[in-house]
Amino acid sequence: MALDKQAFYSQYAQVAIEQQKRYGIPASITLAQMGLESGFGTSTPARRSNNFFGVKVGSSWTGAYDYYSDDRPNEKFRRYNNVMESIEDHSKVLMKSRYSHCQNYSPTDYVSWANGIKAGGYATEPDYAS
């Protein structure tokens, strides 16, 4: 059963705060991306692969993956054993060099983080950071 938006955010707020303390990524960014990318837990990758952030397989990924259609048909998306693995991996993705400019932003500056993540190529939608 899908959660409403507020229940979804409430369920994952504490872990997002923990990720903020550990990595400096605003909890609001983690929650917003998680909700947006997973359709608040209803997307097929979220339900079947515990992939709540739409993270695709890259050259360094050695874990399991599943095929889903996104920008193109049958793209490889990372598969996780549980939602916590997905959240942790999302934080690690945002610590990679393509998003290193974001690490200069305060955890309270969610606007700069959102724009920086978009500029780093996280999503293809023109208004992703809005």
Label for each model-derived stretch:
Residues 1-130:
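Catalytic cores of secreted/periplasmic lytic hydrolases that degrade extracellular macromolecules
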